[in-house]
Design a protein with these regions (language model features):
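N-terminal auxiliary segments of SAM/dcSAM-dependent transferases
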Residues: 2-32, 36-174
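Residue-level signal for the nucleotide or nucleotide-sugar donor/cofactor binding architecture
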Residues: 192, 244, 299-303
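Charged catalytic carboxylate motif
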Residues: 112, 116, 248, 304-307
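Conserved SAM/SAH cofactor-binding pocket of Class I
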Residues: 194-282, 286, 290
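Short amphipathic alpha-helical segments and helix-helix/interface helices
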Residues: 117-118, 202, 309-312
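A short, flexible beta-alpha/helix-coil linker loop
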Residues: 183, 289-292
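Glycine-rich S-adenosyl-L-methionine
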Residues: 292-312
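SAM-dependent Rossmann-like transferase core, predominantly class I methyltransferases
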Residues: 136-228
Length: 312
C-alpha cells in the first residue's frame, strides 16, 4: 500500500439518531482538523440562522438531506460571515500597528470562517460515495485523496469541495509555458498557478558550475522548478519534507520524461553534497500555517528562509 494512503487509526465522531441511539463513524480531515466535540443530525428543514448558531457554538451539523441544499446552506453561511467580517474595527494607534493588527485580525477571521464552515459535515460510504439525494459521484476523487478505506466516515463538505477541486486540477494539470507542458499538482501540494518565478528560472543564464555540478531545488513541491532546470540540461536533486510533495514531484518527473535527471530526496532543506546552482521558492509570510497547503505560503518565524540562508 502507498504509505501516503496507509489507513491509520482515525478519531471518531458520535451522534444520536432519530431513535436516540448512539451512532459512530470515523472522522477524516486531510487538513488535520479535529472532529467537533458534539454533532447533531440535520436536513433540509434547517435554516441558515439556526445552523449558524449551532456552528458558532462548536456543534457540528451532520447533513442527511439533499446534497445540493447542503451546498446552498454553506453558501448562505459564507454570506453571513462575509457581512460580519466586513464591519469596521477600531483604528490602531500607528500605521505600523494598524498593518500588524489588520493582518492578525484577518488571520483570526479566516480561522473562524474555516471553523464554522468546516462544521457542515457529510456521511461517506466505504467506497467514498456520498449517500445523499442529488450527490455527485465523488468516489474517484475520494479514493485519490484518501486511498482505500475499510469503513464509512464523516468529512466536512468544505473539505470535500477541496478534494474534488484538487482532483480536477490533477487531472487537467496547470499549463507551464516554460515547459510547453502541464504540471499536475496533487492534493495538499501548492499549485504553480502564478508563473513569474518559473519564468525567472527558465530564463536565467546558467553557469559552467551549474552544468558541471548540477542543481539543488529546495522545497520542490510539485517539482516544477526541478523540471525546468532538467529540461535545460542540468542534473537536479530536489528535496522536500512532505511525502505528498515528493510523490507529486515524482509523478510530474515521470509525466515529463525526466525521472533520470531529477533525484528526489526527503530532507529538511539541503541534501548532502554541493551544487553549482541552488533554487528555492520559499514561503514568504512569517506566520503559522493552518494546513499543509498553507505551508507553501506561511513560514512561522521565517524558519525555512533563515535555514535556507544559513545553509548556503
Amino acid at each position: 500500500m502507498n504509505p501516503l494512503h496507509a489507513d491509520k487509526p482515525h478519531p471518531t465522531v458520535q451522534w444520536l439518531d432519530d431513535d436516540g441511539a448512539t451512532q459512530q463513524a470515523d472522522w477524516r480531515s486531510l487538513a488535520g482538523h479535529p472532529p467537533p466535540a458534539k454533532v447533531v443530525l440535520a436536513g433540509d428543514d434547517l435554516g441558515a440562522d439556526a445552523a449558524y448558531r449551532l456552528l458558532s457554538a462548536g456543534t457540528g451539523v451532520l447533513w442527511l438531506g439533499d446534497y445540493q441544499n447542503a451546498r446552498h446552506l454553506l453558501q448562505a453561511l459564507g454570506r453571513r460571515l462575509d457581512k460580519r467580517q466586513a464591519r469596521p474595527t477600531q483604528a490602531a494607534a500607528s500605521p505600523t500597528a494598524d498593518l500588524k493588527a489588520a493582518f492578525f485580525s484577518q488571520r483570526a477571521a479566516q480561522a473562524e470562517r474555516a471553523r464554522i464552515l468546516g462544521g457542515v459535515l457529510l456521511p461517506f460510504d466505504a467506497d467514498h460515495g456520498v449517500p445523499l439525494r442529488r450527490a455527485p459521484d465523488v468516489r474517484a476523487a475520494g479514493l485519490q485523496a484518501h486511498g482505500p478505506v475499510t469503513s464509512h466516515y464523516v468529512q466536512s463538505l468544505r473539505e470535500l469541495l477541496g478534494v474534488v477541486g484538487a482532483f480536477e486540477w490533477r487531472r487537467k494539470g496547470v499549463p507551464i509555458p516554460a515547459l510547453d507542458a502541464a504540471i499536475h499538482p496533487h492534493h495538499g501540494v501548492y499549485s504553480p498557478v502564478r508563473g513569474e518565478y518559473v519564468d525567472l528560472v527558465a530564463q536565467a543564464p546558467l553557469s559552467v558550475a551549474a552544468h558541471a555540478h548540477g542543481a539543488f531545488d529546495i522545497g520542490t513541491g510539485t517539482g516544477v522548478l526541478a523540471a525546468v532546470l532538467a529540461r535545460r540540461g542540468l542534473a537536479v536533486v530536489a528535496t522536500d519534507l512532505s511525502p505528498a510533495a515528493l510523490a507529486c514531484a515524482a509523478d510530474n518527473a515521470r509525466r515529463l520524461g525526466l525521472p533520470r535527471q531529477i533525484v528526489l530526496k526527503s530532507a529538511d532543506l539541503f541534501p548532502p553534497g554541493q551544487a553549482g546552482l541552488i533554487v528555492c521558492n520559499p514561503p514568504w509570510v512569517p506566520a503559522p500555517a493552518g494546513s499543509s497547503l498553507e505551508a507553501a505560503v506561511y513560514d512561522p518565524d521565517s524558519r525555512m528562509l533563515r535555514g535556507f540562508l544559513a545553509g548556503l
